């Protein structure tokens, strides 16, 4: 924590220390950047505060019924994503008016202990309110913000740390075999030849080729996928946090059935497949929680099984992109006639209801029913050319692709 000079004040997610001194945090999260619509993966917290206006100073709530994107931000930042009564705080002001800024923003709960956001962050300094000349806060800038503390504190100089790297390709030599001491050579005879050096052997006998790194990763996924079929984690015999996270997500974030025609796929298989896709896209995911639950119960899989799992994930990602492409047109379509839900599954209707709560369509009721039917056709295996031929009979197909498609895929996978 950093205390700043008198006269400082909170201003829309940042601290105005003086006319030419501002402090704010930057969150490093690709998922949050997609949510905010920024080009890179760094999101200044004042930008997040400005997206959810009101009268924010040092904190914003992470739940609002009328602003569903706040809930998505909570899923990205909070260690307890289902704790609705929580808020994001960058610092506080004590009774004397002195402002203290957290090194990392804090998520405050009513039911859990406060904790830092789970995404990486950096405390930044800028001389302008628009943050155009921002730089990471370093010790040489402390005099400009009046950093002080009433108790003794220790500063760690990270530059004095030492590290050593070992070359994995370096060779080692086997010890030479023992042999009796040679006899003294006769006078005038040539010296005996030196014993041959032991051949060099690599430290690592076998290395994976670069092309096999992806297959090795999917081999790990496939082992977890098969372990889900053979092992049922029980509370008390595994990590409680991971157990509760997977249990709740299986029930509340599992509306999309990615393999509806495969009767062997359980809801937990379905959830794991979706989070593998999220991880491969570089988005927030819970694959690590599955590793905690099933890491001690993994069995071997063949190369063919790993390749089949990889192709399954690739195919599902293509279907997600196709689905978002069609839903963009559904969102903009003015339906001339009412669309009935028909035989569409209630879980798919719920998925589209939550999806269109974030991306407002022109005709919500008809968009939900029509979009749900098309979604089931796509993931049911109907060729995309037939899907387009069917859809364009009722609505116009948009050919332009918006920039927030990745965020829409994230919404489909996490609702």
From Swiss-Prot:
Biased composition range(s): Pro residues: 179-199
Region (Disordered): 179-200
Pfam families: Herpes_BTRF1
Family statement drawn from the similarity comment of this UniProt entry: Belongs to the herpesviridae BTRF1 family.
Name recorded for this polypeptide: Uncharacterized gene 23 protein
Gene name per UniProt: 23
């Amino acid at each position: 924590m950093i205390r700043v000079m008198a006269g400082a004040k909170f201003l829309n997610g940042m601290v105005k220390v003086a006319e030419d001194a501002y402090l704010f945090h930057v969150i490093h999260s690709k998922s949050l950047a997609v949510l905010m619509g920024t080009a890179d993966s760094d999101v200044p917290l004042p930008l997040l505060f400005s997206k959810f206006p009101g009268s924010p100073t040092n904190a914003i709530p992470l739940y609002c019924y009328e602003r569903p994107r706040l809930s998505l931000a909570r899923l990205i930042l909070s260690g307890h994503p289902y704790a609705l009564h929580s808020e994001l705080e960058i610092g506080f002001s004590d009774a004397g008016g002195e402002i203290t800024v957290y090194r990392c923003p804090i998520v405050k709960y009513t039911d859990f202990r406060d904790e830092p956001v789970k995404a990486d962050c950096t405390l930044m300094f800028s001389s302008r309110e628009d943050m155009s000349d921002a730089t990471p806060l370093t010790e040489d800038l402390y005099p400009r913000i009046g950093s002080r503390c009433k108790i003794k504190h220790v500063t760690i100089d990270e530059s004095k740390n030492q590290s050593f790297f070992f070359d994995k390709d370096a060779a080692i030599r086997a010890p030479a075999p023992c042999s009796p001491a040679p006899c003294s050579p006769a006078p005038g005879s040539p010296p005996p030849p030196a014993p041959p050096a032991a051949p060099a052997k690599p430290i690592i006998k076998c290395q994976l080729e670069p092309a096999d790194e992806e297959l090795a990763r999917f081999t790990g996924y496939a082992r977890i996928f098969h372990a889900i079929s053979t092992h049922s984690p029980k509370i008390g015999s595994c990590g409680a946090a991971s157990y509760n996270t997977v249990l709740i997500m299986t029930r509340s974030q599992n509306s999309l059935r990615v393999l509806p025609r495969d009767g062997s796929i359980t809801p937990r298989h379905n959830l794991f497949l979706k989070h593998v896709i999220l991880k491969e896209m570089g988005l927030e995911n819970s694959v690590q929680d599955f590793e905690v639950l099933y890491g001690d119960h993994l069995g071997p899989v063949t190369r063919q099984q790993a390749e089949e799992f990889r192709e399954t994930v690739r195919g599902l990602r293509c279907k997600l992109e196709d689905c978002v492409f069609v839903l963009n047109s559904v969102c903009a379509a003015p339906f001339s006639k009412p669309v009935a839900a028909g035989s569409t599954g209630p879980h798919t209707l719920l998925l589209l209801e939550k999806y269109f709560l974030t991306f407002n369509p022109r005709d919500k009721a008809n968009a939900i029913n029509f979009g749900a039917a098309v979604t089931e056709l796509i993931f049911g295996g109907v060729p995309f050319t037939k899907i387009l031929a069917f859809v364009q009979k009722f609505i116009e197909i948009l050919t332009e692709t918006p920039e927030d498609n990745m965020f829409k895929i994230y919404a489909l996978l996490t609702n």
